[in-house]
C-alpha cells in the first residue's frame, strides 16, 4: 500500500487522472490524500468531486477556501466567482449528495507521520490546539448552523491567536488559518493579502507562517496546498504541494513512503 498526497486540484480532473496513472494508483490498495480546493477554476470541478467521493475510504480530503465558498454559493449566500467553473455542480442530479459529502470533510487530517491541511497550521498553535480548533469548526459545518457560519466567516479579523477567543472570532481565526493563511507579520498576526513568493518579500515585514521564529514546533510533518507561489516547497517537515496547475503550472503529488515526487503538467 502507498500513500499519495496531492496539492490543489481546482477542477483539473484530467491532470489528476494522468498523475494517478503515472503511479498505477489502485483504490483497493493505495490511499489518496487531497490538500483541499477540489473545485474552482479548472474545467471539471463536478467530475473531480464525483471521482474523489467515489474513492470512499481510499481518499482523505481536507477543506480549502474554494470548497467553503462552494458551500456558501450552494446556500445562496455567495455568487459563483467570475473565473470559477463550478456552475455544472449546481445543476447536477447528484448535487445534494456531493455537497453533503463535502460538508463531512475535515479541516485537518492526520496520519501517523504527518498532518494535512489546506493552507497551514497557525505558528502559535501546538498540535493539540490545532486538533481542537479544527474539530470545533468541523462540528458546526456538519450541523444546522452551517449557513450561519458560511454567512459570517468572511473576515480578516481576528488576526492574532489568543486562547480566550470564543464563538465567531475563534471560528474565523481557525478557518483563516487552515484555509487562507500564507504570511504572518513578525509578531505572529496573520496577513491575508500577500500572495507573492517569499523571496520577493522582506522578512522584516512578512514571514511565511512556517518560518516564524517563535513558531511552536510540531511533532509531525505538515503537508498543505494553497500557496502556488511556493512552487512546491519541500523540506523535512514542511511540504507545500500546490504548484499552480490551474494557472498553467503543474499538479504535484508526493508518495509518502519514499518521498518521491510526481508531477503532471497542466493540459490547457
UniProtKB/Swiss-Prot annotation:
Q: Does the keyword NADP apply?
A: no
One short Pfam name that applies is Metallophos
Q: Which CDD domains match?
A: MPP_ApaH
**EC number(s) for this protein?**
3.6.1.41
Source organism superkingdom? Bacteria
Keywords annotated in UniProt: Hydrolase
Q: Which GO terms describe its molecular function?
A: bis(5'-nucleosyl)-tetraphosphatase (symmetrical) activity
Keyword Oxidoreductase in annotation: no
Q: Which InterPro entries match?
A: ApaH (IPR004617), Calcineurin-like_PHP_ApaH (IPR004843), Metallo-depent_PP-like (IPR029052)
Q: Which reaction does it catalyse?
A: P(1),P(4)-bis(5'-adenosyl) tetraphosphate + H2O = 2 ADP + 2 H(+)
Entry-linked NCBIfam families: apaH, PRK00166.1
The family classification in the record reads: Belongs to the Ap4A hydrolase family.
Q: Which HAMAP family match?
A: ApaH
| Function recorded in the entry | Hydrolyzes diadenosine 5',5'''-P1,P4-tetraphosphate to yield ADP.
Please state what the protein is called: Bis(5'-nucleosyl)-tetraphosphatase, symmetrical
Organism this protein belongs to: Vibrio campbellii (strain ATCC BAA-1116)
Amino acid at each position: 500500500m502507498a500513500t499519495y498526497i496531492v496539492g490543489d486540484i481546482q477542477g483539473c480532473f484530467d491532470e489528476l487522472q494522468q498523475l494517478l496513472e503515472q503511479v498505477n494508483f489502485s483504490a483497493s490498495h493505495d490511499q489518496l490524500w487531497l490538500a483541499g480546493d477540489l473545485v474552482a477554476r479548472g474545467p471539471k470541478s463536478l467530475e473531480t468531486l464525483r471521482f474523489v467521493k467515489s474513492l470512499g475510504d481510499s481518499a482523505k480530503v481536507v477543506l480549502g477556501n474554494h470548497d467553503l465558498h462552494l458551500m456558501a454559493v450552494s446556500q445562496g449566500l455567495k455568487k459563483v466567482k467570475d473565473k470559477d467553473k463550478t456552475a455544472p455542480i449546481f445543476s447536477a442530479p447528484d448535487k445534494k449528495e456531493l455537497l453533503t459529502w463535502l460538508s463531512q470533510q475535515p479541516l485537518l487530517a492526520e496520519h501517523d507521520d504527518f498532518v494535512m491541511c489546506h493552507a497551514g497550521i497557525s505558528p502559535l498553535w501546538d498540535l493539540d490546539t490545532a486538533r481542537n480548533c479544527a474539530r470545533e469548526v468541523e462540528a458546526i459545518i456538519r450541523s444546522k448552523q452551517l449557513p450561519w457560519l458560511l454567512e459570517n466567516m468572511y473576515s480578516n479579523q481576528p488576526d492574532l491567536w489568543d486562547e480566550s477567543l470564543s464563538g465567531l472570532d475563534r471560528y474565523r481565526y481557525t478557518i483563516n488559518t487552515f484555509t487562507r493563511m500564507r504570511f504572518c507579520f513578525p509578531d505572529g498576526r496573520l496577513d491575508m493579502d500577500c500572495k507573492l513568493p517569499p523571496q520577493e518579500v522582506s522578512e522584516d515585514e512578512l514571514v511565511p507562517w512556517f518560518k516564524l521564529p517563535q513558531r511552536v514546533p510540531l511533532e509531525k510533518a505538515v503537508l498543505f496546498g494553497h500557496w502556488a507561489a511556493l512552487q512546491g516547497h519541500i523540506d523535512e517537515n514542511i511540504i507545500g504541494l500546490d504548484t499552480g496547475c490551474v494557472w498553467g503550472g503543474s499538479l504535484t503529488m508526493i508518495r509518502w513512503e519514499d518521498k518521491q515526487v510526481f508531477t503532471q503538467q497542466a493540459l490547457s
